[in-house]
């Protein structure tokens, strides 16, 4: 469908809805009338001219906004022509209207990508670089030269950061003498640069599998910038400008770009079509993106201002996936009391995209891997969360953008907070609380391993004690950035809890409305500063709107890194009827922890109700006394009021008769970023699991019970698994804990069928014969969906049951094989792809190491019948999934994991070629990710793969450098950094000169994406710390900071967590969390 097809409607112009006029504001002139439907669009509006009025910047002062460049861009016109997707090239003509900020400006510094060739770099080019029509001298600068003599992080990172902080511009243009008079009078001038983009390795993705769906699109690299890869610009978030994007393309190609389509006409000379987009909201180059391809345009059926663009044949999937986009926009508009900031929203689906949605002003570039059809129910919630997060970024991220890199956490954290409100509204409080706990665990884990995260450094010139420097986008570690954004979300939520939800939303409304007002001042560029946000300006808005002073909040959680670690003990004083609490803190140097001073909330659940107290923390050791409101229990059962106000009947026979305390919780509302270890008798944890209604409390109870189960714990866990009123994540977490507890108790599985198998048969077995599962009949209601997810999780927990010898229980594999054999989806309206994948993953988890390992692998004729059956099942599933693919190839990935597990456990010969076959670019991206993850798992965790390890590692590093798909390139260093081949030390098996040289080459390769380069610096630091590798002449033990290792899931387990509800997360996560401080019982156990 061409744009002209949609222009026949009276409500549309050039395929897009007429932009709705902005809401009238007091004192503002009335909006201009919209373009008439029948009016010709061939008459383009005049080119963007320099604003005629330049007002003083002091009048529109915004705290923290500092001009980095010596000039300001007012408008930019970009024309793209001669696009050739097969040769990966196109021509770009850029015209920039800029205003000098200094009278003594003699040189213009701009950003330009390495593969964006200047006229003097193109043989035979007659193009020039001109300023107001006068030819200029220019040169390209390479700040990667002469970076480090020694091959160590300590010699590379400081030099690289200093060069980038001083001058990170690649293009230097000398201002001709003829123009200097205008510069001296600070008059706007026009710069024109013609470039040719050829085979860019980053920032642009060309997809040309076949001519029917070839396309090209932009993506952010490394994190927020990326426009420099395709045009000359100031690729900085504070350089707001008005934009005009022009595309001259073949008739079969359709562009979609930031801004509104203002013109579409045929070029008579060559038969091409000319499209012109205008972005009239001041926008930085970081938020300008586009995509070109054989897209089909579809207006959203419920909203005339939302458009989707799909590749041929994907229209039904796109329509189904984006069905609720209009409701998401309405949700955010209602919460923020503010209209959507752009006239239209365009959503384009592309192949070979990064895993995240690429967000530009009024444009979302979404990977096709997110698409699903109406028979898929497993990924709906995850996809909607990603979509609403990307829409929230249109408000905070595109309209309101950060002034500098280190303020980026503010808009993204606000967008994540808005997403959490959507999750709480649509998916429930329990899901929102579970995600909150997971974010807290991830942040504390990162800080303990790598170092403290400082959201906004108090002194931007002072280096942070980390192995890489996060103060610049091109030197920040991708793992650090990911953890920083999670910590930012937790901090933003803490702020909201302190000032209240309504005042916090008023702050966001104030920021948006001021930004929208200032964006309409097209002739006053100084006013555009209010579209920028900084830490100072945001918190000043908080104070001015709410009237609440929060200086300690800034100093404790924003300007300072680290998290608090509390070790809590308490005793009940029966004579005084009080609880005596002792709280210790640990802030040992280098472990990511910091000492907290301030209030701390404590909830004491007594037999007469729950009571909240606030105690003061003033040092490393604090003591407090809390009065109890109840006496010791007098009866066996009693109705007890909970914190939620609900009254439930509790069996009090297991508690201490002299104490009225049922359990104690510290900081239940997550008002701090912290780790907490509470030492209390096991019956407190059991009561908490059984009767507490907060998901976080139940998760904490399960973690503690798993670490130190009592004789009574097993029945409590069984009740948790069977209780259908419990949140489904608690139920399947309890199933994994039950498996762990039973595996520890040698007498647990001596006789009889495991209790989890009986529970599964009772819940999901046929009434006639419980050993045969019922036919699938998935129903999309809240309760039935939870049952469905539990049905997926129970077999995975059952598969991990082991005897004392380490062998799988004899009932497990026949049970799983029966589930696969008798699975019937013939009458079900929904797909069972994910359920079948869960069964094959369970079968893979049931495989245990062979006795003969590592001596030899048995001959095929000597394999037992059980192993033959497993091989047959996995092979059949893998082949059938190749012939008739499941959604996202989830069944094939599970079957491949099973064959890998058989190799790893010694039943099949080690053969990496099987995995490399499925990592080929011709395979779908989900299978490729699975295969590469398993290869990395073999490199890291298989001690018997020594013969293939170095070859596999070499091929993986080569793939990271040469792979076309950016999602694959970025995944490899992330997995290697999370689960390095070996830990740091002189016994490092990766300590070979070849490996060290290869890694160092990747760490200093200026051609690859900076987030990939920084990712390999994480790997390098994990292996060699800050020093040079011993194989290259470095010390055996490097001085300086080291990575503090904790128990992390292996790469294969990490892959299992890719789905938001996947129970593989519960199997793979560390459990219990670190107990290296404040838990003497655990330390003795270890």
Swiss-Prot record:
It is found in: Nucleus. Keywords: Nucleus, Transcription, Transcription regulation. Residues 1-11 have a biased composition (Polar residues). Pfam families: Peptidase_M1, Peptidase_M1_N, TAF2_3rd. The keyword Nucleus applies. Disruption phenotype: RNAi-mediated knockdown causes a severe loss of RNA polymerase II large subunit ama-1 phosphorylation. One of its GO terms (molecular function) is chromatin binding. InterPro entries: Aminopeptidase_N-like_N, Aminopeptidase_N-like_N_sf, Peptidase_M1_dom, Peptidase_M4/M1_CTD_sf, TAF2. Residues 1067-1078 have a biased composition (Basic and acidic residues). Component of the TFIID basal transcription factor complex, composed of TATA-box-binding protein tbp-1, and a number of TBP-associated factors (TAFs). Belongs to the TAF2 family. This is Transcription initiation factor TFIID subunit 2. It comes from Caenorhabditis elegans.
